[in-house]
Amino acid sequence: MTGCIVGWAHTKFGKHEGVELETLIVDAATGAMVDAGVAPVDVDEIYIGHFNGGFVMQDFPASLVLQAHNDLRFKPATRVENACATGTAAIYQGLKAIAANQARIVLCVGVEKMTELNGAAIGEVLTKASYYREEGGENGSFVDIFARIAESYFQKYGDQSDALAQIAAKNHANGAVNPLAHFQKDLGYAFCREPSDKNPLISGPLKRSDCSPVTDGAAAVVLADTTTAMGMDKAVLFRATAHVNDFLPMTKRDVTQFEGAAKAWHQAYDRAKIGVDDLDVVEVHDCFTIAEMLIYEAMGLAEKGQGASVIADGVSTKDGKLPVNPSGGLKSKGHPIGATGVSMHVMAAMQTRGDAGALQINGAEIAGVFNMGGSAVANYASILEAVR
């Protein structure tokens, strides 16, 4: 697939009381078109990423994007869903439309409104992104799923609590200077390391500081074919994309390694003709701190069982060899399911153009994005580079 991101917009992530789903959609869509300098009449197709699953009563949201401008009326609009990778799935559908010469300019929006439900109801919705008959309902919640992953990893490779606390502290420190982040507070390593009344154990070895928050928000990008993009004010090229799905049941996989994630990363490297050492910055799917550590191994920063060394050696810190999640990641920025993948691409695109403000990594030219659905079931890896 070829194509470029030529504009973007991003609402603040957090709890948006009294703000309707359609307001988040319209704000992000409008902002992205304005940022790209694209008139609504010139948009050829629309894709919206929205997991929902019961967070809000409004399903079938695709045509809500049309409310951003009357000139979007009668444009083809389609909802895309692939669990927590829903946002990237929407972007990839847009890229496919461009690659197939069915569209020249595509608007992609990701959105989720999660906070209207109580905690138990939210947990029940989220477990629908697992193999429900074995992993959901009475069998546990989504945090229980990643707690089992952590426990299995600890049993095989030893206690990794220090590394998980370092990852949490890193991402909160990064998010503290991100004005769009849900949490903008540097918690520090000591707080993240030890259980306390304010940071209790939630499941297995995972504490509250190991878990991404329940969040509302939206993000949007405008995509264009490469020829069109080169005539616009900014263009961030997809040098490569890769999408790999693994088995849904955890019982059919070795949960101490993200094999689907590794395949997606290495397909992306091969297609971009680069290696992990060529990346300058990455945004990865740290829904739980154990996920970020396993992604270190999947992307080739460490051998199996050695992911802790990446954070211990400072490789993934903001001033390290390969900064990971300078935005604060899902852990601090927030994880509104359908918006997450789009948000990650916005954050990475900003880095490649030097537009990331306080989040900017000096000299960042090539960015990686890894967004996953479920427990490394749907795996999406993108390699981005600014060409304008």
Residue spans for each PLM region:
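Conserved catalytic cysteine-centered active-site region
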Residues: 4, 16, 52-109, 113-145, ...
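Buried hydrophobic positions in well-ordered alpha/beta secondary-structure cores of metabolic enzymes
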Residues: 6, 32, 43-46, 87, ...
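Beta-strand segments within the central parallel beta-sheet cores of soluble alpha/beta enzyme folds
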Residues: 41-50, 76-82, 106-111, 162-169, ...
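Condensing-enzyme catalytic core mediating Claisen C-C bond formation in acyl metabolism
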Residues: 1-22, 165-167, 201-263, 267, ...
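Short glycine/threonine-rich loop-to-helix capping motif typified by GTGT followed
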Residues: 53-61, 250-254, 286-308, 320, ...
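Extended C-terminal subregions enriched in glycine
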Residues: 258-262, 266-289, 293, 298, ...
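Conserved active-site "lid/cap" helical segment
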Residues: 1-85, 149, 153-160, 182-192, ...
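Active-site-proximal alpha-helical scaffold in enzymes
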Residues: 81-112, 144-178, 221-227, 333-356
